[in-house]
Amino acid sequence: MAPPAKRAKRGWVPPGYKYLGPGNSLDQGEPTNPSDAAAKEHDEAYDQYIKSGKNPYLYFSAADQRFIDQTKDAKDWGGKVGHYFFRTKRAFAPKLATDSEPGTSGVSRAGKRTRPPAYIFINQARAKKKLTSSAAQQSSQTMSDGTSQPDGGNAVHSAARVERAADGPGGSGGGGSGGGGVGVSTGSYDNQTHYRFLGDGWVEITALATRLVHLNMPKSENYCRIRVHNTTDTSVKGNMAKDDAHEQIWTPWSLVDANAWGVWLQPSDWQYICNTMSQLNLVSLDQEIFNVVLKTVTEQDSGGQAIKIYNNDLTACMMVAVDSNNILPYTPAANSMETLGFYPWKPTIASPYRYYFCVDRDLSVTYENQEGTIEHNVMGTPKGMNSQFFTIENTQQITLLRTGDEFATGTYYFDTNPVKLTHTWQTNRQLGQPPLLSTFPEADTDAGTLTAQGSRHGATQMEVNWVSEAIRTRPAQVGFCQPHNDFEASRAGPFAAPKVPADVTQGVDREANGSVRYSYGKQHGENWAAHGPAPERYTWDETNFGSGRDTRDGFIQSAPLVVPPPLNGILTNANPIGTKNDIHFSNVFNSYGPLTAFSHPSPVYPQGQIWDKELDLEHKPRLHITAPFVCKNNAPGQMLVRLGPNLTDQYDPNGATLSRIVTYGTFFWKGKLTMRAKLRANTTWNPVYQVSVEDNGNSYMSVTKWLPTATGNMQSVPLITRPVARNTY
């Protein structure tokens, strides 16, 4: 008779776990959850330490740090307890020696056993002191209306990163920064998208993005107030739409902007999300900077024999600030196509940070073939009551990074409303119960008939005895007509009034109401081989009959606005409608009211903006045209970077120019955007239309557009968002 099988050694394990706890065997079967899996990996590492003659229980090891990293987002109580246990161990226990780095444990295979350098303890103390000070300061800093930033700023949430930096060589500590030291990698390059199915049809989507960002010295170290007044264009009658007059504050900082769908998701991800999900919402955002490299450029000899020499500068610094409390003007870069770009393998640049400054603008409204002269084409001067000049140095806490350092913003949590990823086909005429048929067709080509007029039953909103589909009472209005292609006057000059893409009129009479024109370049999806210096352009015509059903009907290359406009296309307060021809009711009629229902603007992949800041006014708009998600209270803080002034010995504070060492830098930006989606239930008998590519090389959805050419040319045209129809009533 065979001896009974030995029961596996099982130490103290909390309920629901197999490996989380001391004294366990390594053959307990499959882990029960991610925290238990991290504990199993941790136990296996401890086993290897013991076999090599080291005691991991009395010393803090790399396995302990790995367990901390793997459980930092743990949702289960056991993972949280284990996470903080080993963080406490890290604070008090000496470090275990490795083959490449001597520590304070008893065994070291190579090299002389030495004490840790004194600066490590000094940096630890500085990091903890500055962390406490920054956290206290951040918790007390609020917006002008008393609303705090949801993420708590970069100081509080980057505590783990600061502690890790203080442990490593060259730790800089403080704020949201850390140090890995020269030649030490401080991050990973990751552009994957992960889908975690949570049950009940919910899916957590984690989009990771990484970019190599190039940063040059600013053109000037000063803030500049610059005026643009293109009188050459606007002095020509009919060119009001070409008016560019404004003043802006140009800053020496650059904006690291990831607020575009193409930064986070590859085309196949967008296809999968839109084909299988019914709604989408934002959850959280994390950003970090690592592997900072700063270099100086010097020239030897001159003329045609000049040779440029590039050297690492270990003393130069890069400055980083995050506007967590939204103090500075909000300037999303997607509308100017200046985000981080849509191709992870291509280096990119940050967008120069600039913002509008208040100045009055007076321009006469003109039209084509107008007689007479233009009376007004002037700009005003700054006014004391409206002038707001912001500087980053006076409004933000700035972190200084050197070569090898890193920085993290912490986690921002969104408070937004979900957006549907299906389109509606029902207009007012399709709400409710169809009329009762009196006769049925006898053949497939025949039509049915209704009861004769005068004998029908039903509710109408007309004082006649008719009951027809045109006048039946409906519960609400789906979509609405609104004035469009109109220019409104403002103190800063004329502007095209924003339009909601909710028009439901038929055929060409709708005049592309609510359409948005996208012009973009090589980093954002342009077919540069075909277009050359001119940008590629598409119009997102969301209200086209085929929009959401057929991509080529949604994205067109024709422009909806004619410049200069004809007389009959312009309405001003001096022109009564009755004196003009070809003015349709849709140019002036507004059917928006308390009974109006309409769809939210669609996300536009890849060029569209993702989130937007809520306007700080007592009465908020129901939506924004620029982005599908509007952040309640604060939006994610804008990340700003610049190279610190690298001066020469010729610096003169009274001089007209700065004598600077030519310096540039590169760094890796990495982000994590977490979203939550709902799986779409299959309800129809018939197959549904979905986003799909075609073999035809001339079609809009030809697969060749998303494939590289022999010279590496890539194209990424806009993709639809709402391919599948849904019932709304």
UniProtKB/Swiss-Prot annotation:
Its main location: virion. Residues 1-39, 96-115, 130-185 are annotated as: Disordered. SUPFAM superfamilies: ssDNA viruses (SSF88645). One of its GO terms (biological process) is virion attachment to host cell. Residues 1-10 have a biased composition (Basic residues). Keywords: Capsid protein, Clathrin-mediated endocytosis of virus by host, Cytoplasmic inwards viral transport, Host nucleus, Host-virus interaction, Magnesium, Metal-binding, Microtubular inwards viral transport, T=1 icosahedral capsid protein, Viral attachment to host cell, Viral penetration into host cytoplasm, Viral penetration into host nucleus, Viral penetration via permeabilization of host membrane, Virion, Virus endocytosis by host, Virus entry into host cell. Belongs to the parvoviridae capsid protein family. The capsids of autonomous parvoviruses expose a proportion of VP2 N-terminus and part of that sequence can be cleaved of to form VP3. This is Capsid protein VP1. The lineage of its organism: Viruses, Monodnaviria, Shotokuvirae, Cossaviricota, Quintoviricetes.
